[in-house]
Structures are given as structure tokens and as C-alpha cells.
């Protein structure tokens, strides 16, 4: 099992290329299932979850090729197995995104209940509820969601879908299913994330009729057939936010190419309040910060919430900054359960954190000290890398397969900015 060895204390300087967003690439790979014509996606990140999704669609009979420049070409014309087996999706939550497209195009689908990060309950009941509103018959048996259309029907039917909570993957599933449904679908309480907007723009390129994406009310007029398209995946705002927090923590000056400041308002506002200089520039975002953080940065309290609020996927990384900033802060997690699993590992590095329910109280310290820590989920692993970059001595981050699920060669990008970081292969570790 690979590990990362980090020798802390170096500032980060230079330019880093922000990859395409994992949370846009995964649904967009599934959107290719909606058509029998070729689809080309550019700026697809090299991530474990993307590899798993490509393995999954190939297993269905989709021709899928990926080159070294981030381009993926898919052709689902010969798709013959509308199923997502457990063996292929047990490590990935996004497998549920295959349900809507398969059901919409073929009238039946069998998708395993998803795996992925162990960060609390992420129920699929909202997906099932929404697709049932569109006429689907769905049962859950032996760990699988088995969906079909009623006898005599060949298409889903448009419907008003109001979910009990804002759900990103649910909104994506309904968007894809409604694109081929008969009649109009209205999504109320829809997620507004940039990745939702990017998926909708791809579907529109394929011939879908969608209005209101980027708001809480999305209207879709179903069409009988979608065609192929060429589309570039939007830049990953969470990867960009992670690098912003890393530079804030270590000090330095970095230009994040392709980063979109307008997709990170909540995070950038907090970084500016902390004392960093963050500016949108042509082609990206620049951040500069002074070290040490305990003298130059002020800790910031925040609560996670749905976009455009502070993203839950940035909670752990910003906490790593608060740990070494001046003063006390309160971090409130409102989206997922069990998303403070990085806290115990940060405490091993010398952090002062106390958790009560959904709130973590952080008291900034002057210095962290390197230690061996264990990643527990994707964003927790990124927070431990940030902490390791500022810790005195060596930090060894174990179980970084979590990191590889969501970050495109993170250690190589950090090394390019001056960090002393290396991957130790499982065989050598």
C-alpha cells in the first residue's frame, strides 16, 4: 500500500495546473451511455475513480479509450449489459449515476448499491424516489437496485421531482434520465454546483433541452434521442481549493492555472479574511501568503453547506490551516456524518482540536511535529498532506489510495511547487 513521505517547512512557489473536476467527469462519463453515438471528453483527470468508471462502462460493452493528454473517447453504440456489478463499484459512490442513463435509454438497469468513502450516510432513496416519480419500477434486492419501466411503456415520463434534501448525484441522475423522458420534468430543490452546470451544458451539446441549471429549479423537456458531442470537463474547484489552503498554510506565491475563482467564492472569502492575498487573473487564480501562519494568518470559523456556501469537501483542508493559524475557530459540519475522522490524526501531529457532535473547536498552535498518520477518506487525506507540509520533521501519510481517488498526481504537483514530498510504493514501504 503506497504512502507519502513529507518533509515539512518549505514554502510553495510557482504554477500548478488544475485538473478537470472528478465530480463532473464521473457523471459525464455516464452521460455517454445516453447515446449510441461517439462522445469525446477532454480534461478528464487521471484518478482511481475515473479508472473504475471506465472499467465499469467497458464491462457494459462500451468502447472507451483514454490517452495521456486527458482525452477520453466513448462509444456506447454496442452497449449490451445495462448492469453495474458490485465487484466493479464497491469502492466508488458514483456508480449510482449509471442508473438514470441506463433506465432512460434501455428501459431497465441493475446497479449495485454504491461503496466509496466511509463518511456517513449518503442514502440512495432520493434517487429511487425521483425515478419512481418518472414512472420507474425499482426494487432493492441482494444489494442491487433493479429498475424497469412498466409493461407497455418505452420511455420514462416527465414529472415534478422535489427531493427531501439537496442531492448532487440525485440532481445529476434526474437530469440525465429526464433528457430522454417523455414530456417535461421539473427539478425543485436541485443542486446548484458548477459540476451540475457543466453536466447540463454537455447534455445540451448532445441535444437535450434544459433550462435553469445553476439554480434550484431546473426544467427539462425530454427528447426522443440524443447525439454524440465533444466536451471539456470543468476545472476541479476542490483540487484548486486544496492547493489554495496548502499555499496559505506553508506560505508562498502560486498561480493555479485553469482554476475558476467564481466557483470558489466561499473558500476564497475565508482565505482573504484569514490574511491571504487571492486574486482572479487571466487563465486562473493567484494566491500569496506569508509564513509562519501562526503569526500572519487568523483562524476562521465556518459551517459547511450546499453550494454556493462553504463546501463540505473543503472542510478538512481548511481545518488543517486553522490548526496552525492564530486564534481559535469553530468548524461546523452540516452535510455528512462522520466527517471529522481526520481530527485524531491531526492531533497526532500536535493539533489542538475538540469535537462535540457536528462542531470541531480548533485552537491554533505555533508548530506541528511530523508523525505517521493514516488517511481515512479522500478529503481527510488531503488535509493530512497539508498538515505534513508545515510540520517539523517527517510525516508519513498511510493509505493514500484514498487520495488517488480524487487527486490527479498530487505529490508530483506539490513537488513542482517546491515541496519535499515523495511516494513510497507498497513494496518499498
Curated annotation (Swiss-Prot):
It catalyses: phosphoenolpyruvate + UDP-N-acetyl-alpha-D-glucosamine = UDP-N-acetyl-3-O-(1-carboxyvinyl)-alpha-D-glucosamine + phosphate. The modification 2-(S-cysteinyl)pyruvic acid O-phosphothioketal is found at residue 117. GO terms for biological process: cell division; cell wall organization; peptidoglycan biosynthetic process; regulation of cell shape; UDP-N-acetylgalactosamine biosynthetic process. Phosphoenolpyruvate binds at residues 22-23. SUPFAM superfamilies: EPT/RTPC-like. InterPro entries: Enolpyruvate_Tfrase_dom, Enolpyruvate_Tfrase_sf, MurA_subfamily, RNA3'P_cycl/enolpyr_Trfase_a/b, UDP_GlcNAc_COvinyl_MurA. One of its GO terms (cellular component) is cytoplasm. This is UDP-N-acetylglucosamine 1-carboxyvinyltransferase. It comes from Variovorax paradoxus (strain S110). The gene is murA.
Amino acid at each position: 500500500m503506497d504512502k507519502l513521505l513529507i518533509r515539512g517547512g518549505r514554502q510553495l512557489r510557482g504554477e500548478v495546473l488544475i485538473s478537470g473536476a472528478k465530480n463532473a467527469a464521473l457523471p459525464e462519463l455516464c452521460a455517454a451511455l445516453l447515446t449510441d453515438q461517439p462522445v469525446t471528453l477532454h480534461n478528464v483527470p487521471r484518478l482511481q475513480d475515473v479508472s473504475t468508471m471506465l472499467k465499469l462502462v467497458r464491462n457494459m460493452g462500451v468502447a472507451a479509450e483514454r490517452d495521456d493528454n486527458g482525452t477520453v473517447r466513448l462509444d456506447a453504440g454496442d452497449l449490451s449489459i445495462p448492469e453495474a456489478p458490485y465487484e466493479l463499484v464497491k469502492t466508488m459512490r458514483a456508480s449510482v449515476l449509471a442508473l438514470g442513463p441506463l433506465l432512460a435509454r434501455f428501459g431497465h438497469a441493475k446497479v449495485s448499491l454504491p461503496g466509496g468513502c466511509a463518511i456517513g450516510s449518503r442514502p440512495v432513496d432520493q434517487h429511487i424516489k425521483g425515478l419512481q416519480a418518472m414512472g420507474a419500477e425499482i426494487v432493492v434486492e441482494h444489494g442491487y437496485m433493479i429498475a424497469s419501466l412498466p409493461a407497455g411503456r418505452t420511455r420514462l415520463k416527465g414529472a415534478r421531482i422535489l427531493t427531501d434534501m439537496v442531492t448532487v448525484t440525485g440532481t445529476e441522475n434526474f437530469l440525465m434520465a429526464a433528457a430522454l423522458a417523455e414530456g417535461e420534468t421539473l427539478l425543485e430543490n436541485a443542486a446548484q454546483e458548477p459540476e451540475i452546470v457543466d453536466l447540463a451544458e454537455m447534455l445540451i451539446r448532445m441535444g437535450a433541452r434544459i433550462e435553469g441549471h445553476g439554480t434550484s429549479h431546473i426544467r427539462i423537456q425530454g427528447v426522443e434521442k440524443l447525439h454524440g458531442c465533444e466536451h471539456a470537463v470543468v476545472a476541479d474547484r476542490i483540487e484548486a481549493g486544496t492547493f489554495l489552503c496548502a499555499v496559505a498554510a506553508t506560505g508562498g506565491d502560486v498561480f493555479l492555472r485553469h482554476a475558476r475563482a467564481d466557483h470558489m467564492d466561499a473558500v476564497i472569502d475565508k482565505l482573504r479574511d484569514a490574511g491571504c492575498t487571492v486574486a482572479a487573473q487571466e487563465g486562473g487564480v493567484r494566491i500569496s501568503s506569508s509564513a509562519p501562519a501562526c503569526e500572519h494568518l487568523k483562524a476562521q470559523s465556518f459551517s459547511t453547506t450546499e453550494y454556493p456556501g462553504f463546501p463540505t469537501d473543503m472542510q478538512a483542508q481548511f481545518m488543517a490551516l486553522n490548526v496552525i493559524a492564530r486564534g481559535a475557530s469553530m468548524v461546523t459540519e452540516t452535510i455528512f456524518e462522520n466527517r471529522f475522522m481526520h481530527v485524531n490524526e491531526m492531533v497526532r501531529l500536535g493539533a489542538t482540536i475538540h469535537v462535540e457532535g457536528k462542531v470541531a473547536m480548533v485552537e491554533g498552535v505555533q508548530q506541528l511535529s511530523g508523525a505517521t498518520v493514516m488517511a481515512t477518506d479522500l478529503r481527510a487525506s488531503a488535509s493530512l498532506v497539508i498538515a505534513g507540509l508545515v510540520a517539523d520533521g517527517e510525516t508519513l501519510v498511510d493509505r493514500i489510495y484514498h487520495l488517488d481517488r480524487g487527486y490527479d498526481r498530487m505529490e508530483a504537483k506539490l513537488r513542482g511547487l517546491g515541496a519535499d514530498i515523495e511516494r513510497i510504493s507498497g513494496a518499498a514501504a
